[in-house]
Amino acid sequence: MRLAVVSDIHGNLPALEAVLAEVRGEHVDRVVNLGDIVSGPLWPRETAALLRAMSWSTIRGNHERQLLALPADRMGPADAFARARLAEEDLHWLAALPATLDLGDGVWCCHGTPASDLQYFLETVTPDLDRDGSPGVRAATAAEVADRLGAVTAPLVLCGHTHMPRAAQCGGTLVVNPGSVGLPAFDDEHPYAHRMETGSPHARWALVKRAEAGWQVQQRLTAYDWEFAAQRAEHKDRGDWADALRTGRVGRTEVEACG
């Protein structure tokens, strides 16, 4: 079995189209989309329209939950931008998406962790300061990953949310985060102020294959016209997103929490 795994598209249509072109060349059996699909100052409605036409296995992320449930005055700007531009059929599609998904064949999907769409699975934020004096983010320990797995025992668990491509073996389970298709850096205030940065503007996704020895993962980087996406963000008065899209780092201004 060959799976293409994507997550955290955040309405970045040109990044999605570039990844889709690569996926089509891999002859995969299934494409899995792990949520946070449309929120952001880019192309939410166009992204939703493209994905609704795909027969992908898709779950919702925290941003789908927020833009569907929160009143407009309590939404963050990324969710509010998307919510104002989505058609009714887009909202119905998002509302029907499950929070988690058991694909069978030993594959289980969540956005954050099995328990929460806001929890980091393979990273841990600590109050310890890194070299630039900011709270640090480190790879989660084996014990932390095992605790976050909870009762899930599938051989392959797919997660997103942190935008960081990473994989970790925990006993008999391989946990894979494909990174973000649409936004390579953001910062957040919880549980401590921190940054998640890939350090490059590429779209990220993963190719996961089952072999005799078990599941194997290839983390993929896809080039696309990120300058076009950055200019779109600037046109929508989101210089923070433009910086992240161009560099893979939080730049002149902070990028709102978009995990």
Predicted segments — roles?
Residues 10-15, 39-42, 64-68, 102, ...:
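Active-site environment of divalent metal-dependent phosphoester hydrolases
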Residues 2-95:
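Core catalytic region of metal-dependent phosphoesterases/phosphodiesterases
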Residues 168-259:
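Acidic, His/Gly-rich catalytic cores of divalent-metal-dependent hydrolytic chemistry
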Residues 95-120:
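Active-site-adjacent alpha/beta core region of enzyme catalytic domains
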Residues 2-10, 106-113, 175-179:
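Active-site-proximal beta-strand elements of phosphoester/diester hydrolases
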Residues 112-144, 184-185, 247-248:
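Active-site-proximal loop/helix segment associated with metal-binding centers of metalloenzymes
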Residues 139-167, 171-176, 188-190:
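Anionic-ligand binding region
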